From Swiss-Prot:
It is found in: Cytoplasm. May function in recognizing stalled ribosomes, interact with stem-loop structures in stalled mRNA molecules, and effect endonucleolytic cleavage of the mRNA. May play a role in the release non-functional ribosomes and degradation of damaged mRNAs. Has endoribonuclease activity. This is Protein pelota homolog. It is an enzyme of class 3 (hydrolase). The gene is pelA. Coiled coil: none annotated. The keyword Hydrolase applies. Keywords: Cytoplasm, Endonuclease, Hydrolase, Metal-binding, Nuclease.
Length: 353
C-alpha cells in the first residue's frame, strides 16, 4: 500500500492498495460514515435505439463518491466492496442520492475522507504501508507422504494442500521408495516456489519426515535451506500449523508478522485466564471499566468489533495512557477464541475491584 496524497487538516487520504493484505487492512480502516471516492463501473441504460443494448445497458467507468453504509471483505475471493449513497458523480449517468457499491481494486487509487482519523486508524494505515515492504513466511507441515502449506498473510493463514506423494509405508530402503520420496519432496518444493519473495520457511511436523526433507533441500535446494528452520509439532495438517503459530516460532523469524503476533497475544491472554489472574478483563463491560480506570496495559479487540459504539475513542484512550492496542483478525483461531470472550479483552497493569 502506498499513500499518494494526504491532507491531515481535511482528513483526506488518497492511497493505492497493492496486495490482498492491503484490501484486508482497508476493510477495517474504512468505517460507516466515511466518504470514499474511486473509479467504478456501472451498467447504464443505453437509449440509442438498439433494443438488445438498451435491455442490458452498457458498462461505463467513471469516478464517484459515496458515503459508506456497509463494508464487506470476502477473504476467499479477495473482494472488498463498499456500499453507500452517491454524493458526487456524473449526474447524466447516475442519480445523486441513489445507492451504489464500489469494488475496491488493486492498483487503483481510492480517496478516504473521515471527520476525524482516530489514532488506531492512522496506526493501522502505517502498519499496512510498512508491512507491504516486508516479505512473507511459509510453514511447510510434513507428515509421511502428505504436506500442507500455511502462507502467512496479514489477514490470516492461507492454506495450500494437501500435497500428496506416493511413498510406500514400508520402512525399507530401496531404489523405488527413494525415488518416490524425492518425487514427493520435489512436488512440495515446486508448490513452495510458486510463492515469490518468501523470506522465512518453517519446516515442521510430528515425525522425522521434516528432518529428512530439510536434509534434502540442504543438498538439492540450498537457497531454500538457507531460509529454513525445523520445528516439531504433535499433529499434522492445519492443526500442526496452528501449533507452530502458538509457539511463536514465526514471530521470532518475522517479528512484524501480524498473524503470529496476534496468536501469541491471544495465547498469553488465555494463559492469564487459565491462572485465574486478577490482571485480566474480558467482555465489553469489564474491559470498558478497565479502560476508564486507566488500568489497561494491552487491549485486544476483534476486528469486527472496532466499528461498534464508541470503540474507536476507547482505543484512543488506551493509547493516550501509554497502553498498547492490538486489533485481532477474526480470520484465524485466535480471533475465534477472542470472539468467545466477548470480542474484547485486556491485560491489566494492576488488579481492579
Amino acid at each position: 500500500m502506498k499513500i499518494v496524497k494526504q491532507d491531515k487538516k481535511e482528513g483526506i487520504v488518497t492511497l493505492v492498495p497493492e496486495t490482498l493484505d492491503d484490501l484486508w487492512h482497508l476493510s477495517h480502516i474504512v468505517e460507516v460514515g466515511d466518504s470514499v471516492s474511486s473509479k467504478t463501473t456501472r451498467r447504464i441504460q443505453d437509449n440509442t435505439g438498439d433494443k438488445l443494448r438498451s435491455d442490458r445497458g452498457v458498462k461505463k467507468t467513471f469516478t464517484l463518491r459515496i458515503d459508506v453504509e456497509n463494508i464487506t471483505f470476502h477473504i476467499f475471493t479477495g473482494k472488498l466492496r463498499l456500499t453507500g449513497v452517491i454524493t458526487k458523480g456524473p449526474e447524466d449517468l447516475i442519480p445523486l442520492g441513489s445507492h451504489h457499491t464500489v469494488e475496491v481494486k488493486l492498483n487503483t487509487p481510492i480517496t478516504i475522507k473521515k471527520e476525524k482519523w482516530a489514532n488506531w486508524a492512522l496506526k493501522r494505515l502505517n502498519q499496512a504501508i510498512e508491512a507491504s515492504k516486508k516479505l512473507a513466511a511459509i510453514i511447510v507441515l510434513l507428515e509421511d507422504d502428505t504436506a500442507t502449506l500455511g502462507l502467512m498473510r496479514q489477514f490470516g493463514i492461507e492454506y495450500y494442500g494437501p500435497i500428496k506423494g506416493s511413498v510406500s509405508g514400508k520402512r525399507i530402503v530401496d531404489k523405488n521408495r527413494s525415488k518416490a520420496i524425492a518425487q514427493f519432496y520435489e512436488k512440495v518444493i515446486e508448490s513452495v516456489n510458486k510463492f515469490h519473495d518468501i523470506q522465512n520457511i518453517v519446516v515442521a511436523g510430528p515425525g522425522f519426515v521434516k528432518n529428512d526433507f530439510y536434509d534434502y533441500i540442504k543438498n538439492k535446494h540450498k537457497d531454500l535451506a538457507d531460509k529454513a528452520i525445523i520445528e516439531s509439532t504433535g499433529s499434522g495438517g492445519r492443526v500442526g500449523i496452528h501449533e507452530v503459530l502458538k509457539k511463536g516460532t514465526v514471530e521470532k523469524l518475522t517479528v512484524e508478522n501480524r498473524v503470529a503476533s496476534e496468536m501469541v497475544a491471544i495465547n498469553n491472554l488465555l494463559e492469564e485466564i487459565g491462572k485465574n489472574s486478577s490482571k485480566v478483563a474480558y467482555g465489553e463491560k469489564e474491559t470498558v471499566k478497565a479502560i476508564n480506570l486507566g488500568a489497561v496495559k494491552q487491549l485486544l479487540v476483534l476486528d469486527s468489533a472496532v466499528a461498534i459504539n464508541d470503540m474507536g475513542n476507547l482505543m484512543d484512550m488506551v493509547e493516550n495512557m501509554n497502553g498498547e492496542v492490538m486489533v485481532i483478525s477474526s480470520q484465524h483461531e485466535g480471533g475465534e477464541q477472542l470472539k468467545g470472550l466477548g470480542s474484547m479483552a485486556a491485560i491489566l497493569r494492576y488488579e481492579i475491584a
